Amino acid sequence: MTQTETMAAAGAAKTEPKVRPAKALQGVKGMNDMLPADAPLWEHFENAARAMLRAYGYQQIRTPIVEHTQLFVRGIGEVTDIVEKEMYSFTDSLNGEQLTLRPEGTAAAVRATIEHNLLYDGPKRLWYTGPMFRHERPQRGRYRQFHQLGAEALGFAGPDVDAEIILMCQRLWDDLGLTGVRLEINSLGQADERAAHREQLIKYLEGFQDILDDDSKRRLYTNPLRVLDTKNPALQDMAANAPKLIDFLGEESLAHFEGVQRLLKANNIPFKINPRLVRGLDYYNLTVFEWITDKLGAQGTIAGGGRYDPLIAQMGGKPAPACGWAMGIERIIELIREEGVVPDAVGCDVYLVHQGEAAAQQAMVAAERLRDAGLDVVLHASPDGKGGSFKSQMKRADASGAAYAVIIGDDEVAAGVVQVKELRQREQAEGGGQQATVPADGLVDYLIDAMVGASE
């Protein structure tokens, strides 16, 4: 290379732009990842919930995350906080439809029930779970994406089903080992009873307009019941002395509410009647309830629900009674942590350690045979693709939570055997796991027999 060429090359190198590392992207605020370390708690909750729902004869339903916006406007109520301020809504650029990420599950479950005529052959007990979305300020126990478990009893009118859905929650708290969760109940009566109460309530609240906050003033003539649900400390005395809806209930509504109370008492479920409990959704009538804990600060309500008899007809279906509940899973997971409930870590049955090309091939074949037999197996793979030493692999085997390590090297391949080392079964009783040499073609039977024996 000539001197001129050398100088030109050096100049080009100097002017070559520096490549900056790409900025790491982060998740949306208020929408959280569930990481492997959290999985045992979630599985603990989900397994308990599914078992409880099966015990009461509920069937699962799954609905889309996106629904027509009008579904929630009609179903939840136009003057609710959810519809007015919290929904993620957008216009579909393909057809101009107004769509919304679902903020709750009941409206969608009712829509599916009507659309697919699920009540044609009688009442249904349905349950659902999945992510919901609300555009609000993230804080402990309140997120923009959260997960909800819900149950809907459709086509049942009696107080027995109101009581049963409350009992379902209590059974779940017991199964999860949760304590200190208290039940509050109320009755919202029927539409005509609420109208009579509403008239008197508005007159009462008008006398406090000088102290009402902006939210309460906005609701005064549209949804005055929600004013009683205020969290504003300055309005608590006003709300406590307001006309009580229960004083406006007729004989049928009172009989229904008394029936719920009788059944709760018969099943030894303690409760408190809270005349200010109205829930945040417009579709409720008669029974409403909330399960509350003092261990999560301001976000203490972990489940709530009640009866919503008008909703099915309101959404275009044949009139049918209904009731149900929903619970926020993240809040319950947080409560499980607060209670110190620690579910067993989820480990595999077998970790396969190998070294050498022939051993790697045999290990993969052995892993598939063990999986065919119903065992959970992790086959060692190293980050650099070179396998790693037996010592480093055994460290990974121990960290995996496996009950057994199966070890295959060149000597084992040549002899047609494998080494099986116990990692868990006897380390407490005998100071460490034992190791055995096992014929390769007898590995499946050996491990199954060993695991059965260890569980007895």
Swiss-Prot record:
GO cellular component: cytoplasm
InterPro entries (UniProt xref): aa-tRNA-synth_II, aa-tRNA-synth_II/BPL/LPL, Anticodon-bd, Anticodon-bd_dom_sf, His-tRNA-ligase, HisRS-like_core, HisRS/HisZ, HisRS_anticodon
UniProt main location, coarse: cytoplasm
Protein EC: 6.1.1.21
Substrates-to-products reaction catalysed: tRNA(His) + L-histidine + ATP = L-histidyl-tRNA(His) + AMP + diphosphate + H(+)
Keyword Zinc attributed: no
One Pfam short name: tRNA-synt_His
BP-aspect Gene Ontology terms: histidyl-tRNA aminoacylation
Subcellular location: Cytoplasm
Subunit structure: Homodimer.
HAMAP family per UniProt: His_tRNA_synth
UniProt cross-references to PANTHER family, sorted A to Z: HISTIDINE--TRNA LIGASE, MITOCHONDRIAL-RELATED (PTHR43707:SF1), HISTIDYL-TRNA SYNTHETASE (PTHR43707)
Name of the protein in its database record: Histidine--tRNA ligase
Organism from which the protein derives: Cupriavidus taiwanensis (strain DSM 17343 / BCRC 17206 / CCUG 44338 / CIP 107171 / LMG 19424 / R1)
Lineage: Bacteria, Pseudomonadati, Pseudomonadota, Betaproteobacteria, Burkholderiales
